[in-house]
Design a protein with these regions (language model features):
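A short, solvent-exposed beta-strand micro-motif common in secreted/extracellular proteins
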Residues: 78-88
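Intrinsically disordered, low-complexity Pro/Gly/Ser/Thr-rich segments with frequent PxxP/GP/PP motifs
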Residues: 47-76
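Asparagine-centered strand-capping/turn motif at beta-strand->loop junctions
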Residues: 26-32
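Short acidic/proline- and small/hydrophobic-mixed sequence motifs that coincide with surface turns
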Residues: 33-37
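Extracellular beta-sheet/turn segments enriched in Thr/Pro/Gly and aliphatic residues
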Residues: 92-120
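Cleavable N-terminal signal peptides
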Residues: 7-8, 18
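Sec/Tat signal peptide C-region and signal peptidase I cleavage site
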Residues: 14-20
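Bacterial N-terminal signal peptides that target proteins for export
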Residues: 1-7
C-alpha cells in the first residue's frame, strides 16, 4: 500500500507544470528616446510579455537617462531574453540576447542604428 502511494505521489510530481518565477532588473535607458513600453520574450520565441506593474498602478515611462525596475515572469531554465522597447515616437526596437540570469542592471543604447545592451 505504501509503495502505491509513493508511486502516485511521484507521478503527480511528473505531471506538475513548470512554474515561472517573478524576476526583476533595473533598466537604464541610454537610448536617447523616452520609452513608453517594455516587453520581454525568451530569445527566439516571439512570446512577448509586458513589464508587470502592481495592481492599481499605471505603467511609468522610462525617461532618457533614467532607471526603472522591470518585472517579469521567468521560467527556471531561461536566461537569454529579448527586450523590446516602444518609444514615445511609436517606433520599437528589439535588444537581442540579454542574459538576465546574471544581471541586476541592463543598459540599452544605440551604436548608430544598431541596438546594444549591456548587462551587469
Amino acid at each position: 500500500m505504501r509503495y502505491r502511494f509513493g508511486v502516485a505521489v511521484a507521478m503527480l510530481g511528473l505531471a506538475a507544470p513548470a512554474y515561472a518565477d517573478a524576476w526583476d532588473f533595473i533598466l537604464i535607458n541610454n537610448s536617447g528616446k523616452e520609452i513608453t513600453l517594455i516587453e520581454l520574450s525568451p530569445s527566439g520565441a516571439n512570446q512577448w510579455q509586458k513589464n508587470k506593474v502592481d495592481e492599481g498602478e499605471k505603467p511609468k515611462n522610462f525617461k532618457v537617462g533614467g532607471r526603472n525596475t522591470v518585472h517579469f515572469d521567468k521560467a527556471a531554465s531561461q536566461c537569454k531574453w529579448e527586450i523590446k522597447a516602444t518609444f514615445a515616437d511609436t517606433t520599437s526596437t528589439v535588444f537581442p540576447a540579454v542574459n538576465l540570469c546574471d544581471a541586476s542592471f541592463v543598459t540599452i543604447r544605440f551604436n548608430g542604428t544598431t541596438p546594444v545592451s549591456t548587462a551587469s
